[in-house]
């Protein structure tokens, strides 16, 4: 039984800890049993089968999909500058589409705009993903992350160390469709559009 690192439980005696854990287990048991049953069913459908592997140097990977979460200090005025960039793009960073493994990127400011949380979901392993940023959208990366203290530049040999030093691995990582990549999604969209066009033309010619 691993001792909790929560400082609020520092004064908890061993009997109190055992009683607390037993109470928590009793409360969690019905839902845990349901999760276990769903996992047994999911094991028979490989399309839904996830994993809890490392994504490479840092982060977690489930199936084909990986996560990256990093927290860093923002330069004075950097949060306002980034907000202006986000307002101008209006949720459409077209250049980022060139990274064919990128699912999404999220930027969250906190501690009175002095720190930023960057979270992204992507396909494949960590090193390849960072290389894609460096080779396909270097200008966009430097435009955004130049507002972060200590950013060495995307073409710097130190950039991977910088990212890894600020990255925090997820304690839990769930993906609804862990085997579906960005390339798969785009292919499915093209197939759907082609089918819709075919059906529409068929109805028009009927």
Where on the chain are the PLM-derived regions?
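Short S/T/G/P-rich N-terminal loop/turn motif that feeds into the first structured element of a domain
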Residues: 2-115, 124, 128, 157-206
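Short proline/glycine- and acidic-rich turn/helix-capping motifs at secondary-structure junctions
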Residues: 147-161
């Amino acid at each position: 039984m691993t001792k909790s690192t929560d400082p609020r439980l520092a004064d908890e005696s061993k009997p109190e800890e055992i009683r607390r854990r037993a109470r928590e287990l009793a409360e969690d048991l019905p839902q845990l049993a349901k999760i276990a049953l769903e996992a047994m069913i999911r094991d028979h459908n490989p399309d839904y089968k996830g994993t809890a592997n490392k994504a490479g140097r840092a982060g977690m990977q489930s199936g084909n999909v990986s996560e990256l979460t990093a927290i860093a200090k923002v330069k004075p005025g950097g949060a306002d500058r980034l907000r202006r960039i986000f307002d101008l793009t209006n949720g459409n960073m077209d250049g980022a589409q060139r990274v064919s493994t990128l699912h999404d990127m999220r930027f969250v400011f906190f501690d009175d705009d002095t720190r930023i949380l960057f979270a992204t979901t992507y396909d494949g392993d960590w090193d390849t993903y960072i290389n894609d940023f460096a080779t396909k959208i270097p200008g966009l990366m430097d435009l955004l992350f130049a507002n972060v203290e200590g950013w060495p530049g995307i073409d710097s040999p130190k950039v991977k160390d910088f990212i890894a030093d600020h990255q925090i691995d997820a304690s839990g990582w769930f993906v609804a469709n862990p085997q579906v990549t960005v390339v798969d999604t785009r292919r499915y969209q093209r197939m759907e559009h082609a089918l819709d066009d075919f059906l529409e033309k068929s109805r028009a010619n009927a």
